[in-house]
Design a protein with these regions (language model features):
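Active-site residues of response regulator receiver
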Residues: 55, 83
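Two-component/phosphorelay signaling modules centered on CheY-like receiver
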Residues: 14-32
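C-terminal output helix
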Residues: 87-89, 103, 107-117
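Active-site beta3 strand of CheY-like receiver
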Residues: 47-53
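Short hydrophobic/Thr-rich beta-strand motif most characteristic of the beta2 strand and flanking loop
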Residues: 28-35, 40-43
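Receiver (REC) domain active-site loop signature in two-component systems and cognate sites
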Residues: 58
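Acidic catalytic/metal-coordinating carboxylates
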Residues: 35-36, 62-65
Length: 140
């Protein structure tokens, strides 16, 4: 990693946020935690993390509401949706909304960290495919 990856963690459960913060920070990532999707939506206009990991069910705006807002503002930003309700409907709704991946709770911390790394790697690969207009390839 040339720079510290920034991961936003969105969950109304403080213990989940704490566990993810510690695990991701141990891997050298910078974390910012939010207890609601509403607070993230307000901040997205000013900042953008590398990856967002969000609970699906929270008071106020849901993780799916947040996902819709992110797709509008930052369509390539990878979002991992997690929920204690590991039902098929939640998984399907997450993928249909454009989630990078779905993480059912309870989750293995190492699996969650690995998933965040994969999401960040995917985002970097996607950015690498896009060349700025002043660097567009010209046929030889």
């Amino acid at each position: 990693m040339s720079r510290s990856e920034t991961v936003w963690i969105v969950d109304d459960d403080r213990s989940i946020r704490w566990v993810l913060e510690k695990a991701l920070q141990q891997e050298g990532m910078t974390t910012v935690s939010f207890d609601s999707a509403d607070s993230v939506i307000g901040r997205l206009g000013r900042q953008q993390p590398d990856v967002i990991i969000s609970d699906i069910r929270m008071p106020g705006a849901s993780g799916l509401d947040l996902l819709a807002q992110i797709r509008e503002l930052h369509p390539r930003l990878p979002v991992i949706i997690m929920t204690a309700h590991s039902d098929l409907d939640s998984a399907v709704a997450s993928y249909q909304g454009g989630a990078f991946e779905y993480l059912p709770k309870p989750f293995d911390v190492d699996e969650a960290v690995s998933l965040v790394k994969r999401a960040n790697q995917h985002a970097q690969e996607q950015q690498g495919l896009e060349l700025p207009a002043n660097q567009a390839r010209t046929p030889e």
